[in-house]
Amino acid sequence: MNVLALDTSQRIRIGLRKGEDLFEISYTGEKKHAEILPVVVKKLLDELDLKVKDLDVVGVGIGPGGLTGLRVGIATVVGLVSPYDIPVAPLNSFEMTAKSCPADGVVLVARRARKGYHYCAVYLKDKGLNPLKEPSVVSDEELEEITKEFSPKIVLKDDLLISPAVLVEESERLFREKKTIHYYEIEPLYLQKSIAELNWEKKKRG
């Protein structure tokens, strides 16, 4: 099976399986996603003598995360698969972060959304992944309350490390379970609210 999977919600993570061989790339340089991602993907495919049409499924991170980075990842995947209508596996970036954690237990994943607010989700990782709190935007105060409520064993915050191997494995699973989508159905998981909305909700809570 040939699988390409990538996530650009924060840093660039790319995984590629060609048959039984797995290849992983993590880019932490200063170049913008739009500059580096298409180049790296093309180089990886060329070095492995793989054509895009040879791919069985392509996975892409849909967030939560920086919208600009997510759009670059999604646009890159759409450009690759649209001529061949290759199935796309939509990957929740917070779920991929939790699955990349080597330890089991309650996992809290959080990332700064804007000043005073975080994206946040909580999962139970134990021979699988079960959401205890779906991704949402919360204030810094709410994040403290959520941390107290769930008493997570693991807290993954801001610099989120996603394993390219996990991206590939999840893409394969979605392909096997027939949970892939068409390229024109890809949408980023956009959770941001306006500052006015967030401040109004905060005011209502007192």
Curated annotation (Swiss-Prot):
Biological process terms in GO annotation: tRNA threonylcarbamoyladenosine modification
One of the record's GO cellular component terms: cytosol
Predominant location category: cytoplasm
Location relative to the cell: Cytoplasm
Entry-linked Pfam families: TsaD
Keyword Cytoplasm carried by entry: yes
Keywords: Cytoplasm, tRNA processing
Function (record text): Required for the formation of a threonylcarbamoyl group on adenosine at position 37 (t(6)A37) in tRNAs that read codons beginning with adenine. Is involved in the transfer of the threonylcarbamoyl moiety of threonylcarbamoyl-AMP (TC-AMP) to the N6 group of A37, together with TsaD and TsaE; this reaction does not require ATP in vitro. TsaB seems to play an indirect role in the t(6)A biosynthesis pathway, possibly in regulating the core enzymatic function of TsaD.
Subunit structure: Homodimer. Forms a hexamer composed of two TsaB, TsaD and TsaE trimers.
NCBIfam families: T6A_YeaZ
Family the entry assigns: Belongs to the KAE1 / TsaD family. TsaB subfamily.
Name of the featured protein: tRNA threonylcarbamoyladenosine biosynthesis protein TsaB
Organism annotation: Thermotoga maritima (strain ATCC 43589 / DSM 3109 / JCM 10099 / NBRC 100826 / MSB8)
Underlying gene: tsaB
